């Protein structure tokens, strides 16, 4: 029963794989919950700093920070591409990088060059393969994104925009919608949206809040605009990490379920093979007994 022994070996191998994927599914589920908590915890800060920034902008209409000024003429844009460091998360990276590719083709057709910042090994590898200009990178962020690890790489593009050397800065990441659904996004980071700031200013005005700024509103807004842009980037990275763990959990669950189905099929084949071998042996015994008799 050499065939039966081989099938038993395959069953054992698939069972071991199933144990691994099940463990990875459980780990991803735990990390997903923590990533969602971090993502939600970052939102109030981003909302509050946007409201204060909007209030400042309304209070100083004569001053326009470089981040809200629309640049033109450089023929260069920046792209912050957020992906994962590890794989085994379904088509998440593939989907966002496909969106990045389409955006780059659109910009190239318009004669616009791209300077990229890669956050995550998968995006960095992709950019290197296509020969894109990578001005900075941040990899091996771990399961918890720290702003101090992101500030250095992204500050390169923020400074270039403030100096008027970039026409726009885009951020590409995977937005977390729910456990089963994540959506790749390409959003304009700079110049900051006038519509979003105007809406926040209207909300502030409806509350009737006012502030006294020291040393002056312009000095405060210079600092807050940078913090606001950094908060938006951090929020995108946090959403990407929540999406990663959700996609990995779903992928590992699918792998575990597929392993279970394969084990069932292999056991059926094994039983049929064993039954055929027993039937053959019985036939040989009966034939031998008949020949002797």
Curated annotation (Swiss-Prot):
Principal location class: membrane
Domain of life assignment: Bacteria
UniProt keywords, alphabetically: ATP synthesis, Cell inner membrane, Cell membrane, CF(1), Hydrogen ion transport, Ion transport, Membrane, Transport
Subunit structure: F-type ATPases have 2 components, CF(1) - the catalytic core - and CF(0) - the membrane proton channel. CF(1) has five subunits: alpha(3), beta(3), gamma(1), delta(1), epsilon(1). CF(0) has three main subunits: a, b and c.
Family, similarity comment: Belongs to the ATPase gamma chain family.
UniProt cross-references to PANTHER family, sorted A to Z: ATP SYNTHASE GAMMA CHAIN, ATP SYNTHASE SUBUNIT GAMMA, MITOCHONDRIAL
Protein name (database record): ATP synthase gamma chain
Name of encoding gene: atpG
């Amino acid at each position: 029963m050499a065939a039966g022994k081989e099938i038993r070996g395959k069953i054992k191998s698939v069972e071991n794989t199933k144990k691994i994927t099940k463990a990875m599914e459980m780990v991803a589920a735990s990390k997903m919950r923590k990533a969602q908590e971090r993502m939600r915890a970052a939102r109030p800060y981003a909302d509050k700093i946007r409201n204060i920034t909007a209030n400042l902008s309304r209070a100083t209409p004569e001053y326009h920070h470089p981040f809200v000024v629309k640049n033109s003429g450089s023929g260069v844009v920046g792209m912050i591409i957020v992906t994962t460091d590890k794989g085994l998360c379904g088509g998440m990276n593939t989907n966002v990088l496909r969106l990045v590719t389409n955006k780059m083709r659109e910009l190239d057709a318009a004669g616009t060059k791209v300077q990229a910042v890669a956050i995550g090994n998968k995006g960095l590898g992709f950019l290197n393969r296509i020969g894109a200009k990578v001005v900075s990178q941040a990899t091996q962020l771990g399961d918890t994104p720290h702003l101090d690890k992101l500030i250095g790489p992204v500050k390169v593009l923020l400074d270039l925009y403030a100096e008027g050397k970039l026409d726009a800065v885009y951020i590409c990441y995977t937005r977390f919608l729910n456990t089963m659904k994540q959506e790749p996004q390409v959003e304009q980071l700079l110049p900051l949206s006038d519509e979003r700031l105007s809406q926040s200013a209207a909300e502030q005005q409806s509350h009737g809040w006012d502030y006294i700024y020291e040393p002056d509103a312009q000095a405060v807004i210079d600092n807050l605009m940078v913090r606001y842009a950094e908060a938006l980037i951090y929020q995108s990275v946090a959403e990407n990490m929540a999406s990663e763990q959700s996609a990995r959990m779903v992928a590992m669950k699918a792998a575990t379920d597929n392993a279970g189905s394969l084990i069932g099929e292999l056991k059926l084949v094994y039983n049929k093979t064993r039954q055929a071998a027993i039937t053959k042996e019985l036939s040989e015994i009966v034939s031998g007994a008949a020949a002797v008799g």
